[in-house]
Amino acid sequence: MRAVYAILAGLLATGSASPLEARQSGNPFVGRSLFVNPKYSESLERTRQAFLSRGDQTNAAKVQYVQNKVGTFVWISNIFLLRDIDDAIRNARAAQSRGEKPIVGLVLYNLPDRDCSAGHSSGELSLDQNGLNRYRTEYVQPFAQKLKAASDLQFAVILEPDAIGNMVTGTTAFCRNARGPQQDGIAYAIQQLQASNIHLYLDVANGGWLGWADNLKPTTILQKAGSNARIRGYSSNVSNYNPYSTNNPPPYTAGSPSADESRYATSLGNALRERGLPTNFIIDQGRVALDGARKEWGEWCNVSPAGFGQPFTTNTNNPNVDAILWVKPGGESDGTCGMSGAPQAGAWFDAYAQMLTTNAHPEIRADGGGGGSPAPGPSSTAVAPSPSATPGGNCAARWAQCGGQGWTGPTCCAQGTCQASNQWYSQCL
């Protein structure tokens, strides 16, 4: 447990008797629902229609339940996607006006030279091209300004998934050279996101990555953030497949105190408590590997078979865990690896979404989630279409979602999820 402490303590300084005392008292998720992202619901419509075309009403209804009822985090993975914060704020305010109490989950994910080990989710910023300064001024600052301006809403923000994992275990020169500047970048984000309506969770990878005793040592990042910086806690298992709790740990977990994510939160939380650091966790269960799906813990890409996991709840049976929730939207590919036919990272992988539905947690009910907003159909979109263009032909419902570079033709995306930098990106206005 020595490696994670050094990084975390450095990010939140120890200049006062209890420098990491939470700014907000209590669990920010209690009494609230996790924001249901209409854009994710749109992507799932393709999955629902695929089941309906085969006469599979049961799985189509399970998809509709997810569309209507299951909240997910919104990933802000580049500068362009900062506009998705505005969409989330608008939709969350609409939900609030209907008497709901949403907490908006956002993932801050744009460090320069990110994903230095795997490379499947490398981003737009490079340290050798002024990346750290751009991260601060073009990404973190507007991100923070948008959230602070929406003081009528509550936000849970996950900070830089996998970054600490790569800092602890990354052995390449590329990872080693990125470590210091990335720590500075995360510390800056923590500083900028200090507000009573913002609840910060610093990502600590997962039990299979950092849960071994020799790796559990977080501290440097927290010192760098300064003595007035506060975080609520940590996120784990983001975009991974570990179960929250299991009575039958797979053989590859032998010898680890973190055979599942609840145990990881306990073992790491207890060690953090001894050092005066926060001990609260949120744990991603958007996708969970089925028993026997993996031969080793390091398998992380489009693992098959897997299913949608436990949807949002604060009934965690672990005092260290604030909530079980969905961070990674199931159906978005991890990269061109794992299950056959996988597209590049972030692109919609409908065959995978169908598999997740078929193997879904029992709480994903086959009644469609009645009582919520109707599931979006092909003509329903969370983004207002341009009045000068009409989708047609082979266009998908999400045709107005993306902002391409240099495209002056019709605002119409070909079939597929339109996201920045994927194969459909350049087709959209």
Curated annotation (Swiss-Prot):
Residues 1-17 form the signal peptide. Residues 378-390 have a biased composition (Low complexity). Substrate binds at residues 75, 77, 206, 209, 240, 300, 328, 332. Transmembrane segments: none annotated. Residues 240-261, 362-390 are annotated as: Disordered. Belongs to the glycosyl hydrolase 6 (cellulase B) family. This is Probable exoglucanase GH6D. It comes from Podospora anserina (strain S / ATCC MYA-4624 / DSM 980 / FGSC 10383) (Pleurage anserina). The gene is GH6D.
